[in-house]
Amino acid sequence: MTVVLDTLVAVRRTAMDLLARREHGRVELTRKLRQRGAEPEMIETALDRLTEEGLLSESRYLESFVSYRARSGYGPARIREELSQRGLQRADIDLALRECGISWQAQLEDTWRRKFSGHLPIDARERAKQGRFLSYRGFSMEMISRLLSGRDMDD
C-alpha cells in the first residue's frame, strides 16, 4: 500500500513516523520524504515546524549517530566522513565529536582487542594488517602507531 504525501498533514505524519523509529538529520529526512513523493515546499514547511516544536534536532541526531557508530567500533575520522556524506556541516560534526565524551584512545584499544584478541603484531606484515583495519575504522595513524608499539597499553 503506497501512502500519498499530497497534504502537509500527511508529510508531517510520515516525518514523525520516521523520527519515532530513530533520530534523523534534516537532509536525510528530506531525502526520504522526497523518495515517498512529497513536494519540496511541503517538506520544508513540515520540517521547519517539527524543528520549532523540538521534534527534529540536528544536535540530537549528531549525538545519537556519534554514540552509535563509536559503540560499533568506529573512530572519529570515519564518523566525520559518514556525517559529511549525510549533508551535515563540518563545524557541527567537529563540535559533536569533541563533546561526545568518548575516549577515542580507549575506543581504539577496545576495537583492536575485539578484532585481534589483544595480540600485538609479531612482524611487519601483521602490523600492516592491524594498522589497515584500524585506519579503515577511522582512527588516526598516530593513535594506531602508539597502540601497536605497545606504548599505550593498560595491561
Swiss-Prot record:
Q: Which UniProt keywords apply?
A: Cytoplasm
Task: Kindly report the protein's main subcellular placement as a broad class.
Answer: cytoplasm
The terms describing its cellular component in GO are: cytoplasm
Q: Which domain of life is it from?
A: Bacteria
- One Pfam assignment: RecX_HTH3
Q: Does the keyword Cytoplasm apply?
A: yes
Where does it live in the cell? Cytoplasm
Cross-referenced InterPro entries, in alphabetical order?
RecX_HTH_1st, RecX_HTH_2nd, RecX_HTH_3rd, Regulatory_RecX, WH-like_DNA-bd_sf
> Which GO biological-process labels does this protein carry?
regulation of DNA repair
Answer yes or no on keyword Cytoplasm.
yes
Described by its record, this protein's role is as follows: Modulates RecA activity.
**Similarity comment: family membership:** Belongs to the RecX family.
Stored NCBIfam families: PRK00117.2-1
From the Swiss-Prot or TrEMBL record, give the protein name.
Regulatory protein RecX
